[in-house]
Amino acid sequence: MTLHHHHLTTGRHLYPGLVLARFVQAFEVYVAGFQGRYPLLALAPEFFVLFHLALLLLLAALIPSVAHGRRWALRLAKLWAIVEILNGASHMMIALIEWGYYPGMWTAPLLLIFGAALARSLRV
């Protein structure tokens, strides 16, 4: 598979945007009370916040490695882009099924846009 330099450069710039989109969605979901809405996913608010903080710190820690084009980091970034595409799509689909607001619905398009653009640009 051919890896084009301009794809890497674009991906390097898109990854921080995806991390920021994850932060914004985590904030929306927390404020909207997602963690208490579904029994199977019910988490104590403290755990919900700590989990997302740890996740965001991990994702942010990858930014320099992605920026330097380290292959392992680019692969993780692409995997994370796919996870966020699925996450964003699921929030939007559930909102459509419920025909109303679903926590994370407003920020889900950010995950879809940044995730799809990043996954497309990182053809590794």
Which residue stretches match the model-derived regions?
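Core segments of alpha-helical transmembrane spans in multipass integral membrane proteins
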Residues: 17-32, 43-66, 79-82
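Membrane-interfacial loop-to-transmembrane alpha-helix junctions, especially the N-terminal start
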Residues: 9-16, 72-80
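Hydrophobic cores of alpha-helical transmembrane segments in multi-pass inner/ER membrane proteins
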Residues: 53-61, 109-121
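Non-cytosolic membrane-interface motifs at loop->transmembrane helix junctions
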Residues: 38-45, 96-110
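Membrane-interface helix-boundary motifs at transmembrane edges
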Residues: 3-9, 65-74, 124
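Cytosolic juxtamembrane helix and N-cap/initiation of the first transmembrane helix
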Residues: 1-21
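"…centered on the first transmembrane helix and the immediately adjacent amphipathic helix/loop
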Residues: 33-37
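Membrane-helix boundary connector in multi-pass membrane proteins
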Residues: 70-71, 81-82, 88-106, 121-124
